């Protein structure tokens, strides 16, 4: 059986860091960034829940630099690896204007066994 991945309606989204999302130093809280990355990964996985286990079997998050108040950020997804048993999804967050990376996250999912 071939695994056909349904791509989400969008492969990226943008947001502006606002006052409620930053610390006293005006840096974006890492928990806010993590939630945005995680929810975007879920948007990719949910349409594929009939063929993929929805809980990631592996996860890695790499913070590269801080984001600050009023910065425009772009979150993108990309399939990094796909075979008959496993899918690795890469989520990247970068500054919109300079394309400087803020963080990268990889989520590894297994395909459900055919019944």
Walk through the language-model features, giving the residues of each.
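Hot-dog-fold acyl-thioester-processing enzymes
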Residues: 2-55, 114-115
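HotDog/MaoC-like acyl-thioester-processing domains
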Residues: 3-4, 67-69, 79-115
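Residues in well-ordered beta-strands of folded domains
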Residues: 16, 62, 108-110
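Generic secondary-structure boundary/loop-capping signal
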Residues: 19, 58-60, 99
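Broad hydrophobic/π-residue packing in well-ordered secondary structure
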Residues: 19-21, 33-36, 63-64, 69, ...
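Hydrophobic beta-strand-centered segment that forms part of the acyl-chain substrate-binding groove
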Residues: 41-79, 85, 103-106
């Amino acid at each position: 059986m071939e695994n056909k991945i349904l791509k989400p309606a969008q492969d990226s989204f943008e947001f502006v860091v606002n006052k409620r999302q930053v610390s006293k130093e005006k840096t974006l809280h890492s928990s806010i960034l993590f939630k945005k990355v995680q929810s975007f990964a879920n948007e990719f996985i949910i349409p594929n829940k009939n063929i993929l286990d929805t809980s990631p079997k592996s996860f890695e998050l790499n913070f590269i630099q801080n984001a600050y108040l009023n910065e425009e950020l772009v979150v993108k997804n990309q399939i990094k690896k796909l075979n008959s048993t496993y899918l690795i999804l890469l989520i990247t967050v970068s500054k919109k204007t300079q394309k400087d990376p803020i963080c990268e996250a990889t989520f590894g999912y297994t395909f459900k066994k055919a019944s």
